[in-house]
UniProtKB/Swiss-Prot annotation:
Membrane topology designation: Multi-pass membrane protein
Record function comment: Receptor for neuropeptide Y and peptide YY. The activity of this receptor is mediated by G proteins that inhibit adenylate cyclase activity. Seems to be associated with food intake. Could be involved in feeding disorders.
Residue positions of covalent lipid attachment, annotated as S-palmitoyl cysteine: C442
Organism: Sus scrofa
Family membership: Belongs to the G-protein coupled receptor 1 family.
Record keywords: Cell membrane, Disulfide bond, G-protein coupled receptor, Glycoprotein, Lipoprotein, Membrane, Palmitate, Receptor, Transducer, Transmembrane, Transmembrane helix
Identification of the protein by name: Neuropeptide Y receptor type 5
S-S bonds: C114-C198
Region of interest (Disordered), residue spans: 297-325
Glycosylation sites: N10, N17
Gene designation per UniProt: NPY5R
Topology feature Extracellular, residues: 1-42, 99-117, 178-208, 391-407
Amino acid sequence: MGSEIPDYYNKTLASENNTVATRNSGFPVWEDYKGSVDDLQYFLIGLYTFVSLLGFMGNLLILMAVMRKRNQKTTVNFLIGNLAFSDILVVLFCSPFTLTSVLLDQWMFGKVMCHIMPFLQCVTVLVSTLILISIAIVRYHMIKHPVSNNLTANHGYFLIATVWTLGLAICSPLPVFHSLVELQESFGSAWLSSRYLCVESWPSDSYRIAFTISLLLVQYILPLVCLTVSHTSVCRTISCGLSSQDSKLEENEMINLTLQPAKRSGPQAKLSHHPKWTYSFIRRHRRRYSKKTACVRPAPAGPALESREGRPPGKVGSMQSQPPPSNKFMPGVPTCFEVKPEENSDVPEMRVSRSIMRLRKRSRSVFYRLTVLILVFAVSWMPLHLFHVVTDFNDNLISNRHFKLVYCICHLLGMMSCCLNPILYGFLNNGIKADLMSLIHCLHVS
C-alpha cells in the first residue's frame, strides 16, 4: 500500500494467472477509465510539479541547516534531519513514478523497477512516519524527565537504525508479490496495441487484505495514537508546570509589592532584624477571601530581649498593621492579623509578572503547534489509507471513470505532508530556524 499506485488492473486481472491479458478495444471500462484523468492531466502535472519542488526544496534546506552544526545538535534535531531526508526520498520515489503511471496507463520502467519501486515507495513513507513517532517519544521523555535526560547521539543512531530496519522488514513482501503483466488490446483477430502494467499479485485476497490492514495500523493508526498521547502529555506537563510557576511568581510579586515602601508615604518604619522575626504575606482562597493577611511569629518574651530589640514594627512600608496586644503573643505560635492600607497612600495594584505572561504565551504556542502537527498528519494521510481499504474490500464502490482522479487527490494530500513537515518541524524550531537563517544569509552573500 504505502504510497505506491494501487493499480486499477489489480482488480480486473486478479483472476489471471498468465503474463498476458487480452482485452477488447471496444470495452467501455477502458475508455471511461482513461477519461477520468485526461481532462485534467495538465493541471495534475502542474500540481504534482509544484508539490514535489516545494517538498524537495523545503526538506533540503532543513537538512542542510541541521548538517551545518551537527556536532552541536540535540537528538530531536538529529531526528528532524533524518525526517527531512526521508521526505526527500518520498518526493523523489513517489511523485514522478506515480504520476507517470497514472497519465500513461502503463508501466514504463521495466520489470526490475516493477519489483523495486513499490518497495522503495512503501519503505520511505513508513520510515518518515516512524520518525515522527520517534520525535514525539523523545520530546515526551525530555519533558517528563528534564533532569535525568541523558539522550546522546548514540540513542539517535539507534532510533534511526531501528526505524529503517522496521521499515524494510514490514515492506519486504512487496518485491515478492509484484509482477509485470502485459495487457494487449485487440479488435477481432487483430492485435492493436500492448502495454505493460505493474500489479500486485498476491496468492489470495486474504493476503492482500491482511497486508493492507497491517499497513493501516502501522502507518496511520499507531502514529496517530502515539502523537496524540505524547503531545497531550507534553501539553499537560507544561500546563501543570506553568500553574505552579504562576502561583510562585504571583506570591513573590505580592510580597515585593507589599514590602516595597510607597514613594509618597510618610516616614517609614524599619523592620526588625531579629532572626526569629519572620514575615510572610499570603493570599487566602479567592472564592472566600479577598483581603491580605500577615502571619507574624514573635520572638520569645523576655525583659532583656525586649529592651534590646524593642517591639515588632507596627508599619510595613505604607501598610498599617494592627496586631493584638503584645502580652497575648505566645512564643513560637504564629499570630495572624489583617493588613490594611493607609487611606491616603497609593498602594500599587497586583499585576501579573512579565515572566508569567511569557510562560503563558509560550505554553499556548506549544499547544497550538502540537495540535497542528496532529491535525496535519491525520488529515493528509487519512484519505489515502481509506482509499486503499475501500478498494481492497469493495472495488466497485468507486466508479471506473473517477478511480484515478480520486486516487490522485488522495495521493497529493499525502504528498502535502512532505511539504508541511519542514515548516512544522524545522521553521518553527528556534534552533533550526536560526541555523536556517544563517544558511540563507551565507547563500545570499556568496
